Each structure stands twice: as C-alpha cells, then as structure tokens.
Amino acid sequence: MGCSAKARWAAGALGVAGLLCAVLGAVMIVMVPSLIKQQVLKNVRIDPSSLSFNMWKEIPIPFYLSVYFFDVMNPSEILKGEKPQVRERGPYVYREFRHKSNITFNNNDTVSFLEYRTFQFQPSKSHGSESDYIVMPNILVLGAAVMMENKPMTLKLIMTLAFTTLGERAFMNRTVGEIMWGYKDPLVNLINKYFPGMFPFKDKFGLFAELNNSDSGLFTVFTGVQNISRIHLVDKWNGLSKVDFWHSDQCNMINGTSGQMWPPFMTPESSLEFYSPEACRSMKLMYKESGVFEGIPTYRFVAPKTLFANGSIYPPNEGFCPCLESGIQNVSTCRFSAPLFLSHPHFLNADPVLAEAVTGLHPNQEAHSLFLDIHPVTGIPMNCSVKLQLSLYMKSVAGIGQTGKIEPVVLPLLWFAESGAMEGETLHTFYTQLVLMPKVMHYAQYVLLALGCVLLLVPVICQIRSQVGAGQRAARADSHSLACWGKGASDRTLWPTAAWSPPPAAVLRLCRSGSGHCWGLRSTLASFACRVATTLPVLEGLGPSLGGGTGS
C-alpha cells in the first residue's frame, strides 16, 4: 500500500531534517579541523589573551627533583690505587617550584623573562633525610689537583701545603643538605681571595647551591604572535645568540626552546630541541613512539645514543672535546674549569669501560634513560623525566700529596631525575578542551552526515511505495475489467469491426447493469468501450429528428 497524506507530510519533514543534518555534517567535516587548528594556534602563543599564558607564566605541573648519591665505600683503598666501590643512596626528593618574572614583550615578536626556581625537601617521597651522611670525593681538592697537573712543581707543593693547613682531604663525609645547598669551606674563601672570579660561590660550596632561589639566565624567546612556526624558540640567552664554551660554531649554537613548551602540530619526523643552561649546550631528542597519558595522545621523545658520544664516534660532537671515553661530556669549560663530566646515569649508552672501572654501577635502559611525552597538537609536555649524572675525573697528581695513588677514573658523584606530570584540575581541563571536545566534534560530524543520509531515504522510500501501490491497484483494476468483459461476450470479442454498428446486447446488459463492476474500472479500453456501447443507441434514436430538422 502507498503512504497516506499525513505520512507523506511526515516523510517530507524528515527529509528536510535529513538534508539539514547531512549539510551540517559535511560542513563540519570541512570546517572543524580548520577551526580546531585556529583555536590551537590562538591559544598556545605567548600572549596575555591566550589560554596557555598563565600555564606558561606559572607552570601548574608539579616538578620533582630526585637526587641519588654514590656513597664511596672504600676511600682509603682508592688512595692506594684500588678500584672504587660505590653504593647508590636515595632518592632524596625535592619539590621544585618555578615562576617567571621580569616578563617584557619586545617589538620583534619576542618576550624576555627570568625564571626562578626554589626547592623544598619532601621527606614522604624520600628514602632518607637531608641529615644523612655521604662519603664522596672532595671536588675542590681533587678538581684543583687535576687543574694543577701541568703547573710548576713549586706551585703544586704550595697547593699541597695549603690543603694540609686547611685540613682538606681527598674524600669528605658531608650531609645531603650540605652537598646539595652548600657548606662553609676555608678553601672557598682562599680561592676567592687569590683567584677572584674563578668560582661562582661566595661563602659556601654546594653542587646545587646556584639553582635554589635563583634564575637560570635571561631568556628571550619568540611569542608566535606574528610567526607561529617560531613559537617558544630561543632568540637569545643572557643577550647571546650563541655561547662560547665550546670549540665549534655548531656546538655553540643555541637551538630549540627553553625546554618547557614546543611548537604545535608535531609529527613523528619532528625533533625536540632545547637549550640547557645547566649543561651549557643545546640538546636534541628524537621521536621514539606514540602513546597515551591519562587518555591524552602523546609522542615520546628520547635521547639518541649519540647525545654524549665523543668526536670519534659522532664527529659533530668534536667541538665538545677534549673528550675521554664516548658517552660522557666534559663540562669543565662552563663549570669553573673543574674536570666534571655529564652523562646518562650509571654511564648508560657510554663506553662499557667506564662502568666497569667502578664497582656498584648497573646501567639500565628503563630506569636510567630520559624521556619527554609531548601532546603533539599543542607541543605541551604531559609527562617527562630528564635524568643526568655528574661525575668527577680524578687521578694521582705528582706533587699534590692528597691525591695519593689514585688510578685515573671518572667517578660518579650523583645522578638526578627532574620529573613532572600533568595532574589534577589542570589535567582535567586540558583533557576536556583539547581531547574530549575535539573528539566529540570529530564523531558528531560523521554521525550527522550518516543520520542525514538515513533521513533523506524516508521520503524516497515513501514515494517509491506510493508508486508501487498505484501500479498494483491499476493492475488489479485491469484484471477485473477483463473478467467483467468476458462475462458479457462469450466469444471474447470486444467489438464488431464495422464502424458505428450496434453493440452486442450482452455488452449493453453488462455495461448498464454492472456499474459496480464495469463503470468503476480504470482500464482505458474497457471504460471507453462501455461508454460507447451505452451512447450509440441514444445517438441512433436522435438521428431521424436531427435529420428532419435539417431538412426543414
């Protein structure tokens, strides 16, 4: 059966709604990606009106500095030339707070700022307290000894006398707090008196004393307002477009960002570059794999094995030399000339002889490799852990008695992990606005398009059913007409061939008495035959009168 008038009206309304849904879905497919991109570009740039500005200014991600010390177990034996033996202690965990100040927007699409850091010890997250004692090399003594190796013997003997007078030894037993944030040492005052400007320390010497309650230098970075492709990239550091610590222009270049955010819309072909003031160099991390952090898609970037390779293994690093074994970087040129080396913890990815020279080292790829998980659409870190180790090169130096018979060795002092992960309300807001809503819009556009297509089929189906129903009724009428006709004409002939001959009596009876059957038939042939059959007798009766009227 066909659709009623009411059904056809409803089908038409659904068709209109379907057309609107299909058009809206198609428009969304074309426009939504562009709109999302525009919103991301608008809100990741460094501008007070952008949504990410406060996140950039006051980083809401809780950062933690976890420090592991290498406690020297056999200092006396080392002085006799035996192999060092160490035991890892820690972690000693500090909550790191960061905030930017002196924010100045410049006319060349850049912004300058100082970022200050403060650290607070976290006993609940630590394995030990800041009052724990650690035996470790005396950097001031052993570092100075290596620095004096090629000096005149007289000067070295004077240095030995000074060490003895001040009570300085090759190894010291200090608390975690003293090693981290500084301890008073008469040798520091002596060095500052006779070698002013050599040390960045005034009264105390500590490995992290420079970092607490201080800034990491004046950064000038691009805002991305005028050119989004340069957003967060460092223009200058402390007014310099390149440093002068190293021996090649490539190694002295300041590349990448300040290490907090990166340009948006990353791909697996992207690399992660940043300038590290602590390492005095730029570093490049490479894409490893895609992942998910708390429902948010991420790209994981890791350090290539060539990061700390020496020049013989990786020629571009030749500018960081003089080098020892591959896998450690000499940072003496930016660390008051002390023979300090930077590497991955436990000499991971370094020449195996380095770890074999010290008992107690166990490099592990999972535990000691650094990584950054970045949201590729915005360039914002979701989860990161930067792990580095600081070591001291020490050896016996003729003329300086405190060095004894120490065999040349790169002895680890400590390694640290600077980690942070987005959490809490910040994570929820980020997920809702940058993951959930785009995902809903992505699926909604296809749902609308599919729904529109389905609704558009309703009036089409209704029209098809109406046409099929009409055809079926016509077919039934034709069949019924032939049946009626056959009852009044046993010879199955519809009409004599002679023009205007009288119709058979059976036809007249059928057509006059069968109004319920024949008059209502829709068959063109049957209807025409019935009408002619009933009309001809009338015309025949009127013929003589019409003819007489004419004759008169």
Curated annotation (Swiss-Prot):
Residues 33-443 are extracellular. Glycans are attached at residues 102, 108, 173, 212, 227, 255, 310, 330, 383. GO terms for molecular function: 1-phosphatidylinositol binding; amyloid-beta binding; apolipoprotein A-I binding; apolipoprotein binding; high-density lipoprotein particle binding; high-density lipoprotein particle receptor activity; lipid binding; lipopolysaccharide binding. It is found in: Cell membrane; Membrane, Caveola. Widely expressed. Keywords: Cell membrane, Disulfide bond, Glycoprotein, Host cell receptor for virus entry, Host-virus interaction, Lipoprotein, Membrane, Palmitate, Phosphoprotein, Receptor, Transmembrane, Transmembrane helix. It comes from the Eukaryota. The keyword Hydrolase does not apply. The keyword Transmembrane applies. It is a multi-pass membrane protein. The chain crosses the membrane at residues 12-32, 444-464. Pfam families: CD36. GO terms for cellular component: caveola; cell surface; endocytic vesicle membrane; extracellular exosome; intracellular membrane-bounded organelle; lysosomal membrane; lysosome; plasma membrane. A lipid is attached at residue 462 (S-palmitoyl cysteine). InterPro entries: CD36/SCARB1/SNMP1, CD36_fam. Changing residue 2 to S: Correlated with higher plasma triglyceride concentration in subjects with hypercholesterolemia. N-glycosylated. The six cysteines of the extracellular domain are all involved in intramolecular disulfide bonds. GO terms for biological process: adhesion of symbiont to host; blood vessel endothelial cell migration; cholesterol catabolic process; cholesterol efflux; cholesterol homeostasis; cholesterol import; detection of lipopolysaccharide; endothelial cell proliferation. Disulfide bonds join 251-384. Belongs to the CD36 family. The C-terminal region binds to PDZK1. This is Scavenger receptor class B member 1. It comes from Homo sapiens.
